[in-house]
């Protein structure tokens, strides 16, 4: 019967209250499960459903596989809007619920569908229980829904990838002469046994109708249920079906036997029986019978899950009268049920695997479920347990068998099934579409779509075909006997395989283990598996056809990819040589010289026939030559005529590249390399001997020729961009930057001296200089600067803070003489993670001579710097940190002439000055790795002049006096504009020049301020000063409050 709208409304009202009662506990829920820790997932909510531990679900959760992103379909009675399904349930039926009356008019409410859905995908939220795939979504439709909506067809066209069916047709129950039910000694009804031939014949009789029904939207009535399942399977869904609860002697009925009429959908069909908690078939469960080849077992006895019940709002009876009065409410609850209807353990299991293997089809997921099941009863597939109990711990590690007809016992074989000889796996690459054009079409967005690994040992008579642009790593010891084809992407063998391997198109085989035979057909490659170097061992023949490619990666200490076979047939093809650029060389004083090395990259027992067409390094600085030596093929490495600076485009880059080119001087060292090329002991002894002989001796000690790590790292560059990235970081530009910054910032000393002289002469208030009547003064410095980078040099930022102190006095009536000192700290942040700090002490002498309105200030300063530098070197796999501490000095002389032209409105002073600055360091000696630099004592000078105008004006209001000083000037640099430092690598005597950002020939000087005298004791001041040019911008801001008391 159908529940009416009045009862549904009451349910919704109740559910709202029920949800509110849970809110506080759910909001406080914190997930105790941790990645990598299976036991941490077994909280109280987990343990309430014993089937979760029985199928080892915790191992999937510990690897973050929870069914997320997968949708489960359920065909059953109506699924209640239980809190366990909040935000994840979609119903495709008419929205009603199922209930019935007994002879006394008491109502019974149908919650079978709710219980089933909870087992598959109830939420994990700290309350009640949770399903196997607790992060999956659910789409439900009713088995018997006679409304206007065709929920079954909508389900077929939906995103649901696995559909649960916990229903079936019950056989008759035997009765005695009195018409009473006959009960068996175990307490079960005596069901009439289905007969295999009768069951299969029923399916076959309806085959044409089912075929027709499956090719169009499924109608209602007739054989529509079977047509629904067939159509869904043909649309790429996995059909999970309960076997039935009709005693162990019985077999599944016609709906579950559909693959006998349609063997092409068998791989999308999975029948499930019911286990008790001791791994015995429950006494109520139907056995596998003729469906054993597509059946697995799962926990199904006393399974705790979500349910609902009718309750009275008044506390009265739950019957027809109360229903008619609107006194009944649906209450969400939990309860235990038993039977093969608990099949959704497998349905949720499949959803977890669909997240784990997002690229697999439903048929392949079914194969993983079956072949990783734990065998029960008789060895192999049997009539009670089929493939065995599902095991999620093993299933998340990939298939354990590639199934063909030969792997199925004859008594259980479905004619026409398991006809595919190859397990075709498409690792599509991140973001690509899988199963395009079907209802289950989806975009592959997880990491497994680009790289995945299977660690199970795979057996069976089938083979493997790898397609798609991604990489599949096969880690187990595999004994499957079918062929292996690699047609796209990479198949990496970190385990062994007994079958023959063929690669074609854009396929790649990689690895360091054993295969049976090997043939590269065309456009294919062999290389390492991305985990170091090793030998791919071929027990029989290795064949390279024209158009194929053999990829070999080379490294130091004689390490390289290698192929060892009984025989090799080279029918052409290319050898592509690459260098291992993952080696971290900077921490080494020496690296083995690559150029001049010889590698054995192919070794055989019975000889090499033919030749490769060519050997192709993809590097401008390295070339290779093949050497065929009897049973072996070798590879020699030499340097090309191209120089490193041929890829450089700027002068700094060229200078560094030329210096690196000189680092190739070699010398023998006593270090030895252990060059082990032994084959695993499990291989045939004669092949092992062949490989060892080709290497001259296993664990042979060989003298290594030393090379400079930087030089060796440059050999692998392929583009100008790579070289520029390296030369910029190796150049040590930060030292030239600091020298330039010290010269530029010397202006703050001379500006302060001239401002103080103008202040003392009464020509400017100079509020940022605090002075007393005895000629003592102080000034706080704070400025920041920026140098704009160019193609040759990276930019940098500076900041300087400190204090200057001075004392001066009148000299006769028309002059002044003073002395100044101070401390400042300059910080410079360069490009590429370079930092410099300079602690600086200053000493200076200044004075002026006045001739009426004409003033001639002059002075000199001397500065001592203590410089600390730190810079990073990071390019490719190379990383290092270089540090240095050294001393430097800066001296300067300056002179100025200014004419005071004042009137009642404004004071003007045109001026001109000239300054000479000389910087000298005491030598640079970095500490670090191979990229550390050194430099001799060196100096540089600069001469600059400034022409400008100073102006200030003052006026008095009723309450305050305001002064507005300002300055505008044009600065001109003489001589060379480059600021460079000469450096060299520590193991070299060849110096190179590195330029900082050049100074601008011309620039502007700008100063502006305001002084507000609130009264004779309180003065507020604000000022800005800047030197602005195309390449450098220096700025300072000062603000002050003077309060005399």
UniProtKB/Swiss-Prot annotation:
Matching entries from SUPFAM superfamilies are given as:
Autotransporter, Pectin lyase-like, Subtilisin-like
Q: Does the keyword Nuclease apply?
A: no
Family named by the database record: Belongs to the peptidase S8 family.
Give a Pfam family name: Autotransporter
**Entry's localization field:** Secreted
Specify the domain of life of the species encoding this protein: Bacteria
Q: Does the keyword rRNA-binding apply?
A: no
Which residues are the active-site ones?
76 (charge relay system), 112 (charge relay system), 341 (charge relay system)
Protein name per UniProt: Extracellular serine protease
GO cellular component, as recorded: extracellular region; outer membrane
Molecular function in Gene Ontology? serine-type endopeptidase activity
